[in-house]
Amino acid sequence: MPKVGMEPLRRKALIDATISAIGERGSLDVTMSEIAGRAGVSSALAHHYFGAKDELLFATMRHILAELTIDMRRALQSAKSPRERVSAVVAVNFSDIQFQAQTIAAWLAFYVEAQKSSALRRLLKIYARRLHSNLMSGLTGILPRAEADSAAEATAAMIDGLYIRRALKDGVPNAATAIALVEDYLETKLGERQKQ
């Protein structure tokens, strides 16, 4: 008989194990059995909770996005100005939870898999829209809409690019450096606007 109340804990353990396994391999080439072993549960239980591996991968991506969303809401609520909102978005994207090797590897693996999976592609589109919207929530208070849109696109591209460099272990070594690079771009962009 299953232990009452264990399902949420086991689901979370399986999701964490998925991130860990993908991070170690650098790809989605992991088995349910391997993930279950890392989580300390049987393969049968992993299949019971998630069905197929694709469903577990989808749940893992949703979990990563949910963590990002929670942290983003908290950061945006404490921002007191449009400029602080933009900086909050940048900082959350490079937080300790998001900008660690295992999570970065998971992000990149999901990007690759989204080319084949409509469900993962949909999640990545949601992420991209939210990132753009969150950046625009600050930038439109500083720049005209068209310029804000362009700056949001460039900032999002920098964030994604810095993730790729970190995953390849080529370039940006840590979150502080990544934040500084993006903030430098923003200061340059916003400074140009103030000179006009």
Curated annotation (Swiss-Prot):
Question: What domain of life does the UniProt record list for this protein's source?
Answer: Bacteria
Coiled-coil region list = none
Question: Which parts of this chain does the entry mark as a DNA-binding region?
Answer: 31-50
Q: In which pathway does it act?
A: Amine and polyamine biosynthesis; betaine biosynthesis via choline pathway [regulation]
Q: Which UniProt keywords apply?
A: DNA-binding, Repressor, Transcription, Transcription regulation
Q: Which Gene3D superfamilies match?
A: Tetracycline Repressor, domain 2
| Cross-referenced Pfam families | TetR_C_6, TetR_N
Keyword Transcription regulation attached: yes
PROSITE patterns in the cross-refs: HTH_TETR_1 (PS01081), HTH_TETR_2 (PS50977)
Domain HTH tetR-type, chain residue ranges per copy: 8-68
Q: Which NCBIfam families match?
A: betaine_BetI, PRK00767.1
Job of this protein: Repressor involved in the biosynthesis of the osmoprotectant glycine betaine. It represses transcription of the choline transporter BetT and the genes of BetAB involved in the synthesis of glycine betaine.
For this entry, the protein name equals HTH-type transcriptional regulator BetI
Query: What gene is it encoded by?
Result: betI
